[in-house]
Structures are given as C-alpha cells and as structure tokens.
C-alpha cells in the first residue's frame, strides 16, 4: 500500500531530525571528552630521602609553590604510634597512609590520632605547609606569598582538621616529603597505580655530612633511630649505634637507587635523583630541574626566594626548621667539625653508597681539611634515569 505524500514527507522530516539530533549528541560528547582530556592530570610527588639530608629544604622548595599542597613527613604519626616496632614492619602501614593522603583522604589519620575534635595543627609540622596557611584552609594569608612558619603557626593553628582535606583537593600537585621508606618494593603499588601519576624525587647527601648533622640533633632523632635499629639495639654498644644506623640508611639509599634501574622505562622516567651538594652549589638551576620534572612553573618570586634562602649565614642545625643559611658552607661543615677517626669509620660503613653516588673518600686528616680538594665527583646519571 502506497503512503500518502504528506505521510512520506512527515517520515522524511522525522528521520532528518533524528540524524541531526544524533550528530549533535556525538559532537557534544566529543567536545566533552576533549575538555576532560585537556584538564591537567593531578600530579603526586614523593620527596624520598633520609633524616638530615636537606629534605626539609627540598620540601619547602615544593611547598612554597602556589600550585602545591605539601605535607612534611605524615608517616611520623605511624612511627610515633608504634614506637616499639621496626621500620620494616611499618613499611606497609606507612605506604597505605601515603596513598590515602595522596588521594586527600585524611580519615586515614583516625588510626594515629586521639579521638575527638582535632585541628589542622594536630598534623606533624603542619606549619611547614603553605597550603594550610592560605585559602581555602586559612583565609588570612594570600596564597601567592612566601609564608614563614612562625606566621602560619600564630595565625592558622585553630582551623578545624576538616580544612586539610578541602585544601588538598583544591591543588593540582600533592607533594609529600618522607624519610621512613627503606626500600622501593613497598612503593611498587603506588608507582604502578595509573590514577596516582606518582613521581619520586630521591634526595641523597654525603653520608659524612648526614652523620655530622645527626650528631648535633640526636635528641630529636632518638625514637626514629631506635625504630631503625629494631632488635639490634640491644646487641650494639652505645658508641656503635650511630654507625649502624648510618649503615642501614646508606644501604637503603643505595638499594632504592639500584632498584629503580631494573624497572620498566616508563617507571624510570618518573624518578629523579638529586644530590644535596649539587643543589647547594646551584640552587636555582637544580630547583628549576625539579620543577620541570613535576610540571611546575618556576615563578619569579620563587626564584628570588630560592636565591635568598641559600645565601644566609645560618648553619641549619635545628632538626626541622628551614631558614636562611649558606647552603655551600652547610654541605662542607663536616670537613672541619668531624674527627678523621669518625670519618674513616663512616666511609667503611657507607663506602658502596658513596662510590656509586659520587662522593670521594678522604685518606687522611690533611685531605679532609683541605677545602680546595673537591670531594664531589662529576657524576653522570645513567641514561635511563633523569
């Protein structure tokens, strides 16, 4: 049966409208997909180091950037909850806490803090986080200013704990500084998680400088040192304990460095090794290198701040403070302040790490005191690692 002409025309118009609607749906879907892809992926950065290696300073280099949410050593809460445990037994708990914080899930701290109302000042060293001292966490200080920790502590300590999570979610980069990992294996699940886009900045320092700094702040590090020694503490003479701790630290830094080279190239490209001494000699250039690695713009006011903070007169003896200091003198201080006997013993404990990372041994007190003798070798990173 033939359809009337009006019916044919109506069907034709309906079909054309359906095609047009489908076209607009597909077009809008593609535009939506493109805009979603155009949004920058959130970057998660782990500054991985050890105590007294300049990591607080490196943390501040990231933390003062207006695009960064930064926390300093959140795993401190895990270790202080389980003081009788060992570093290796706590690796998984530390890793799980780090993952949660990267995802801005601050309920993870419930297991490590007293129940009841909390403030953001309940977090260890919270005042070192510019993000917790500016909006949306604390509206008093402008977001794009360099914020001294003393001002932060004075003005923002009463903010409720809930603002930590809110602040975390408002930044493109989440940076955590941690000194409580002793191998890379425990971090594999985070490295392989595509949703995290994890980048590791591995900061190392001359073990002799680390040892000298640890001696001057040993009271602050007593609990951490006991956890590192674990069951070995009772077997070691008191005078041997600092060297054992340094041996463990050196071995762990060495293993982390070597392990990264066995990973697939895609993972190796998310690892950056930085020597503190290189940073001390060329702070602006090395900071630029780290910023570029994680996709941050090196803003002019930050360049000025980095220059000034590394040209002060302080020697950086406090365990957790970052203030103006002469970075080059700090990196060399062990050469005139440590007895050669201690240096010689330390070189035996950390020799492999020193050799691989480019720290030359001294063979006499005369070599140690001769500041014209450069003990930092010109060191090329293997091709597959930045």
UniProtKB/Swiss-Prot annotation:
Glycan-bearing residues? 30, 308, 329
Expression by tissue: Specifically expressed in HEV. Weakly expressed in spleen. Not expressed in other tissues. Expressed in colonic mucinous adenocarcinoma.
What induces its synthesis? Upon cytokine activation, it is expressed at low level.
- Classification via Gene3D superfamilies: P-loop containing nucleotide triphosphate hydrolases
Task: Spell out the molecular function terms from Gene Ontology.
Answer: N-acetylglucosamine 6-O-sulfotransferase activity; sulfotransferase activity
InterPro entries, alphabetized: Carbohydrate_sulfotransferase, Gal/GlcNAc/GalNAc_ST, P-loop_NTPase, Sulfotransferase_dom
- Organism superkingdom: Eukaryota
Pathway note = Protein modification; carbohydrate sulfation
Keywords in alphabetical order, please: Carbohydrate metabolism, Glycoprotein, Golgi apparatus, Inflammatory response, Membrane, Signal-anchor, Transferase, Transmembrane, Transmembrane helix
Transmembrane intervals: 8-28
List of residues binding 3'-phosphoadenylyl sulfate: 51-57, 205-213
Nucleus recorded as keyword = no
Q: Which SUPFAM superfamilies match?
A: P-loop containing nucleoside triphosphate hydrolases
Residues making up the signal peptide according to the UniProt record: none
Q: What does this protein do?
A: Sulfotransferase involved in SELL/L-selectin ligand biosynthesis pathway. Contributes to generate sialyl 6-sulfo Lewis X determinant (also known as MECA-79 epitope) for SELL recognition, a prerequisite for continuous lymphocyte homing into peripheral lymph nodes and antigen immune surveillance.
What name does UniProt use for this protein? Carbohydrate sulfotransferase 4
- Source organism per entry reads Homo sapiens
- Upper lineage: Eukaryota, Metazoa, Chordata, Craniata, Vertebrata
């Amino acid at each position: 049966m033939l359809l009337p002409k009006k019916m044919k025309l109506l069907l034709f118009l309906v079909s054309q409208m359906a095609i047009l609607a489908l076209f607009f749906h597909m077009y809008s879907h593609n535009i939506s997909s493109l805009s979603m892809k155009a949004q920058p992926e959130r970057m998660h950065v782990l500054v991985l180091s050890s105590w007294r290696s300049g990591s607080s300073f490196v943390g501040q280099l990231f933390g003062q950037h207006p695009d960064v949410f930064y926390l300093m050593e959140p795993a401190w809460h895990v270790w202080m909850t389980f003081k009788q445990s060992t570093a290796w037994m706590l690796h998984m708990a530390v890793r799980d806490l780090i993952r949660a914080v990267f995802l801005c899930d601050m309920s993870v701290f419930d297991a490590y803090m007293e129940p009841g109302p909390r403030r953001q000042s309940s977090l260890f060293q919270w005042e070192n986080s510019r993000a917790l001292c500016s909006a949306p966490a604390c509206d008093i200080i402008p977001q794009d200013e360099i914020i001294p920790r003393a001002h932060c502590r004075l003005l923002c300590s009463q903010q409720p704990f809930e603002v930590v999570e809110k602040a975390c979610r408002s930044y493109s980069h989440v940076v955590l500084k941690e000194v409580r990992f002793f191998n890379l294996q425990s971090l594999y699940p985070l490295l392989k998680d595509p949703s995290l886009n994890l980048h590791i900045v591995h900061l190392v320092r001359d073990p002799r400088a680390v040892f000298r700094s640890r001696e001057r702040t040993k009271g602050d590090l007593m609990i951490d040192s006991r956890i590192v020694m674990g069951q070995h503490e009772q077997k070691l003479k008191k005078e041997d304990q600092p060297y054992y701790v340094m041996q463990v630290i050196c071995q762990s830094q060495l293993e982390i460095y070597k392990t990264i080279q066995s990973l697939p190239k895609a993972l190796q490209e998310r690892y950056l090794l930085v020597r503190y001494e290189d940073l001390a000699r060329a702070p602006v250039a090395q900071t630029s290198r780290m910023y570029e690695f994680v996709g941050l713009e090196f803003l002019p006011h930050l360049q000025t701040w980095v220059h000034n903070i590394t040209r002060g007169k302080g020697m950086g003896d406090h365990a957790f403070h970052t203030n103006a200091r002469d970075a080059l003198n700090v990196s060399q201080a062990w050469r005139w302040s440590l007895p050669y006997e201690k240096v010689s013993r330390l070189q035996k404990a950390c020799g492999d790490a020193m050799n691989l990372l480019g720290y030359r041994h001294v063979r006499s007190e005369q070599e140690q005191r001769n500041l014209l003798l450069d003990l930092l070798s010109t060191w090329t990173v293997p091709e597959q690692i930045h």
